[in-house]
């Protein structure tokens, strides 16, 4: 039919126009979409479907009592009253803060995990009430570079804490920085009383630091605020790589037993706020022999007498002590607050007069001896008659003895008297 024939071509043209419009729209969408959202021409349909259906990998779990940041690779478990190290620490952790908890004991293998915490580099365990750290407590941490055990009252620090639990094999520790500030236990928790307990505590710390070859790579060591009286003789012998040593705010009265000769890389030594009174020539010579060291000595009670002369001369010539201009005398009273660099040889004398306390002691002793002497004389006076009679008896006895002696001598001297004596005897 004519009508049907006329509608056919117009309908076909309409469908063709719609198809062209659809192709144009599809091309515009393809051009505006990101190239990464479309599969490449070399990707098969099966691969495209697989990639479209794949899910992102699940995030690592975070312990319930902690805060985790995978981007910063940091885990913080702060003030959570934890009794032990969380078991489900994420393996990506590089910085771990376990502070302000209630972990009194840190046993061997406390950080052993599967998979291991191979990237853990910074570990802060300060303020956890730790009393005991076992041998090999930090094993299985091959990347550990900084360890902070400050503000824990350690009564039992194993000699193999940093060396590993296998005591027959000395395993080098990866540690570069070790912070042990204020780890001294309270006085009532020290063994064998106060002084003996301090000596035992110093020996315990020294044993942990010199265990085998464990810490020979250590660069930074802090031992501030531990009430040390003396440094153990071999405390620093196994730390040849040490660059920074912090001993401030202790009670050090002398460095006689310490040796710094082996610390050839030492750059800074902090001895502020101790009880040092004078430094001897042996210590000064060791410091002068270290090429790069800087020693800080402020806030010590220096005694400015004749024993200080060598130290004052050394201070005036050396550049080892950056704060030498701030060093002042604490004793004797007449020299208080005078700068060490301002002293001359005439100022540094040993006063022959005794200290006031010693003078008082001698006066008291003299009074006691005088009283004893007075009592003795009084006893003699009260017994003067008896003493006089006793002396008369002694005199009479001596006289009788001497008369008998003279009589026998006269008889023996005269032969006639001798014969007479013999005949009379017969």
From Swiss-Prot:
Signal peptide: 1-31
LRR repeat start-end pairs: 92-113, 116-139, 141-163, 172-210, 215-238, 239-261, 262-281
SS bond list: 62-68, 66-77, 304-329, 306-350
All ranges on the Extracellular side of the membrane: 32-361
Transmembrane residue ranges: 362-382
Domain LRRNT: residue ranges: 53-91
Transmembrane helix keyword on record: yes
LRRCT domain location: 289-352
One annotated GO biological process: mesenchymal cell migration
Primary localisation category: membrane
Changes after translation: Highly glycosylated.
Annotated segments matching region Disordered: 34-54
Subcellular location: Cell membrane
Ranges of biased composition (kind: Low complexity): 34-51
Chain positions found as Phosphoserine: 424
Presence of the UniProt keyword Methyltransferase in the record: no
Any one Pfam family match given in the protein's UniProt record, by short name: LRRNT
Sites carrying sugar chains: 124, 166, 281
Function text: May function as an inhibitor of Wnt/beta-catenin signaling by indirectly interacting with LRP6 and blocking Wnt3a-dependent LRP6 internalization.
Name of the featured protein: Trophoblast glycoprotein
Source species: Rattus norvegicus (Rat)
